[in-house]
Amino acid sequence: TTEIYTLSLHDALPILSAKKENTMKTTTANPVTSEMSRSRTTFMVKLALMVAIIFVMAFSPLGYLRTPGLTITFLTVPVAVGAIILGPTAGAICGGAFGLTSAIMALTGGSAFSAALLQINPFGLLFTLLVPRILEGWLCGLIFAALKKVSKNGAFVIASLSCPLLNTLLFMSSLVLFFFHTEYIQNIASGLGTSNPLFFVVLFVGIQGAIEAVVCTILGSAVSRALTAALKK
């Protein structure tokens, strides 16, 4: 009996030891998994908040300054902030949200200009409203990620400035590509006194693009810098 007990105990020791090691590994791994899950959840909450801000601004007076001759958008500000504090992927999603609000306005008649283009080329309009905005947010995030290694303060300013500039450049490039040859845009170009696509872009954007660039640079850099500091605490 004693011999059987000794053998059984001897055989059981490796099993108990293995179970103990597995338990220790599981216990050690759990905090890492938990931290990753918490980090992912925090990222999603922040991203959802930025997208919500874009939608609230888009469908309220906060998102646009409309005058008889100008429609100035401030939606590049939350796109820039999202791209800077959350990265290029989040920037692309925020840009996509911006484009989606523009598409909704076009489909519901909220923008006379977009509604007119929708009748001419629906695919061209949706491409013009969505793709440039997605690229704008993504590229803004990449610019900040690259420049912060050199000068973080400078990165905030340049990335914030790049967002409205990219928005204007990419949007107008797409607009010219799909619609410059149409009678509707040709009439606008004639009213501006030009038949050259480049001059049309400059004259069409004009003071509107300059105001958007200044506002987004000031607000985007200030807000993103403040949020970055606050999120570290």
Spell out what each predicted region is.
Residues 1-13:
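Short, small-residue-biased leader/transition segments that mark boundaries at the very start
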